[in-house]
Amino acid sequence: MRFNYSDLNPDLIMDAIDLSGLRIDSGLIELNSYENRVYQFQDEDRRRYVVKFYRPGRWSRAQILEEHAFAARLCETEIPVAAPIAFAGETLLEHQGYPFAIWQSVGGRQFEVDNLDQLEWVGRYLGRIHSVGASHSFHHRIQLDVESMLHEPRQLLAAGEWVPSGLAKSFFGVLDELIRHVCDAMTLDVARISLHGDCHPGNILWRDGPLFVDLDDCRTGPAIQDLWMMLNGERHEQQIQLDTLLAGYEEFMEFDPRELALIEPLRAMRIVHYMAWLARRWEDPAFPRHFSWFNTEHYWRQQIATLHDQLEALKAPPLSLMPQW
């Protein structure tokens, strides 16, 4: 869908916020977000809020409301998640064709992924999130699957002639081999539950403990999707991190060790989907401005090397649980 935010000017934003009954007593501070448009403001009581304008056409109303309901359900079970505010019973508002929601503005430090105490704490809450997610299925949110994460991106990249002609054979050759490996791996018969979906360290703030934000990509998939992005560094470091994460996680939710074989396939899916996401959003002026390297030959040479490296990772033995597991 062709769309940009050119009509989303300050007057329209403030008129939209007025619909909620809040009265702005500050300027608008634009926060870092490419998929949506997010602004911080202060009301006349000097309370800080964040308003998010969803990209029209990306999610249906039912899908957004299901995201909000999931956040509310997690909050009801005392899981620290940022949930939108309801105004007259409605969390999703709309103005001039722009769907939007408002949150209390929450501050916090960056989650220290290399801090094992913090990592175990995050593991406990992910176990609790997944306990809720396993008992409340999504009906409108999308599935984490190879069609949307691999096949559709492959078609988009080929049809759009994004890859320089001199590199296309090498790029699509390694991409197609990677897709075959991932498709085979993703046939693994494991439970699919309701997930945060984009649980990387940047979506966890630290206050007196973890605070999970941005459920915009919540979806149905294997539990490991919310865990693998916590792992970084060399293999032995990832092994320690995994052990620590699961020590907290399994206090609340049993983990199926077979899912460890999905870490590299899921990483591969994220890599490919990201390339297609940039291509899909290129007509939004924010993207050429912030990702000017995307349509350069150097970038695509790098991606060929990245795909080759990821193909080798797919062929390597997966991480395993420590002996006590």
Features from the language model and the residues they span:
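ATP-binding pocket architecture of kinase catalytic cores
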Residues: 43-138
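A glycine-centered beta->alpha junction motif in the catalytic cores
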Residues: 56, 100-113, 154-162, 274-290
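ATP/Mg2+ or Mg2+-diphosphate-binding catalytic cores
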Residues: 276-325
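Active-site activation/catalytic loop segments of kinase-like enzymes and analogous catalytic loops
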Residues: 223-254, 270-286
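All-alpha amphipathic helical-bundle segments outside canonical DNA-binding/catalytic cores
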Residues: 141, 257-267
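A cross-family kinase active-site recognition segment
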Residues: 112-169, 190-192, 290-291
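Active-site acidic catalytic loop and adjacent metal/ATP-binding pocket
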Residues: 35-51, 84, 180-227, 325
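Conserved NTP-binding catalytic cores of kinases and kinase-like/nucleotidyltransferase enzymes
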Residues: 1-86, 320-325
